[in-house]
Amino acid sequence: MLQTIPMPSRELTIALAVLSLLMVLVQRAGSRRRETKQLLSLPPSPPCANIIAGHLPTVLKAAKEHRQHLLFQKWAEEYGEVFFVQLGTIQEYFINSDQAVRAIFDKAAAQTSERPRWIVSNEQICNRLNLLLLSSSEKAWKSQRKATTFGLTNLNLADAGLPFLHFETLKFLNDIGQNPSKGADPQSLWSSIGRYTYSTFSSQIFGLDVPEDNSPVIDYIFETGLAQILGMLPGYYLVDTFNILDKLPLFLKPWERDAKSRHKRDYEWCCDKLKKVKSQIDAGEAPPHMTFIRRVIEDPNHLGLDSLEDASYLGMMLIIGASDTSRISTWSFLEAMLTFPDVCNKARKVIDSAVGDRVPVFEDLERVPYIRQVMKESWRWRPPVALGHPHTTTRDIMYKNYRIPKGARIHLNAWAIHRDPTRYPDPENFIPERFEGDTRSSQESAASPDVSKRDHFVFGAGRRICPGYHVADRSFAVSVMRILWAFDISLKPGTKLPLDPQSFPGDMPGNPGLELPVVLTVRSPERLETIQKEFEAAVQSRERMEPLVG
């Protein structure tokens, strides 16, 4: 007997009709989006005559002349919020306004947080173990990012690192005070700043310090980090522009032989430090403070990392990331104080009135808001990573009337944004007062949903924003306050204002190099006596640490 098919209820009929209508609307909307994508044009691009290399010769020439940041600033002024350059087979898009950053890096973070393929830096020098170079979709990136936050850079741990920062900067003041020749020679001064930044972070990560300015480990770590960062710059390695070169036999790829040799050397160096820390723990001789590596060792899950050896390698990468940006920021601050002595004098008076005859500490920052303004302006004026570390897109990104295609490389062009006169009037001048009333930390400012209210873009934007902002605030604040309190900052004899930044270019675009004509001199015998007394007391109370060597 045939079964009677039940008729749908009135409610079900209405629901099916609504669902069908929604499907049609979604289909039409998708079709319109596809049509819109097809209609939208790519952003503008500077003209170039070289069909094969594109803009690569122009970019490489600018890099050789230490003017890469200026070239991309010029193009931003000519072509607007977004433009692209063709570097061989690769298109690099530069994001040059705060609103474009908000739309592309923040709101579209799920599609703009991957990294390009860096054959030399990521795959060969780092063997895909460097947090900075990994794509955000990779398991290793997620586990390393989590371990970094919970093991080193969260607010509580940033505060826990203050005793090391205070000791190392105090040692720096004492070293320059006891050896005036160090303060008069830029190379020696650069090394002294490097010592205290590396020692501050190696103490927190490995429980091993860097007691001497001439320690080979300073140059070793700096050179290791520089090799990785330079390999991320547009056009630095031709194999990253023309990937087909990677298919050559090894004997025709000197860059790969050198890169893999570097990784082997660096990984062995990190494993040696791990072995040292483990032996200290086993012998009951480890420093009493909890280090990053010790947290990883004692955590049953190693803070989510794959191995202790990989954790040690991450530790080295964190020293590089924290120390090098801290040193570059301090060096650029000195350039600003030389170039704008009125700002230097005002900042020094503010410090003197707040702390008197004692050495400043981080907690004094809340009492001297002008110093926070100086910090913000320093980072705006000389961003340590001027052109941003490139991201890649995982789908087409629409911004206004432009389409950035899937697979494109995108740069947050901090240098150009920081030089936008509509955002920062008179951008070439160093004017801390432009941040008057802004008492926010770097984290608070970067999290502002109103992008026009953010102080600067030094820490990036979106999902990949630098997790070290709490650490950076403390490191930079203590350095700035103590240098101003302790020293006269003056030009090298024979040097006159205005300074030409192109006469002392640094390794990183837009930042000063070792030829910076700076001299630090202790302000008075009384200041020197205070420094000596406080340093002697700090030495007596400080826990014993073995040196970082290798």
From Swiss-Prot:
Stored Pfam families: p450
Classification via SUPFAM superfamilies: Cytochrome P450 (SSF48264)
Endpoints of the signal sequence: 1-31
Record note on disruption phenotype: Does not alter the amount of produced r-N-DMAT.
Factors inducing expression: Expression is negaticely regulated by the global nitrogen regulator areA.
Region (Disordered): 430-451
Gene3D superfamilies xref list: Cytochrome P450
Claim: Disulfide bond is one of the keywords in the record: no
Keyword field contains Heme: yes
Alphabetized UniProt keyword annotations: Heme, Iron, Metal-binding, Monooxygenase, Oxidoreductase, Signal
Residue ranges with Basic and acidic residues bias: 430-441
Segments crossing the lipid bilayer: none
Binding of heme, residues: 466
Purpose of the protein: Cytochrome P450 monooxygenase; part of the DMATS1 gene cluster that mediates the biosynthesis of a reversely N-prenylated monomeric L-tryptophan (r-N-DMAT). Seems not to contribute to the final DMATS1 product.
UniProt family annotation: Belongs to the cytochrome P450 family.
Protein name, per record: Cytochrome P450 monooxygenase FFUJ_09176
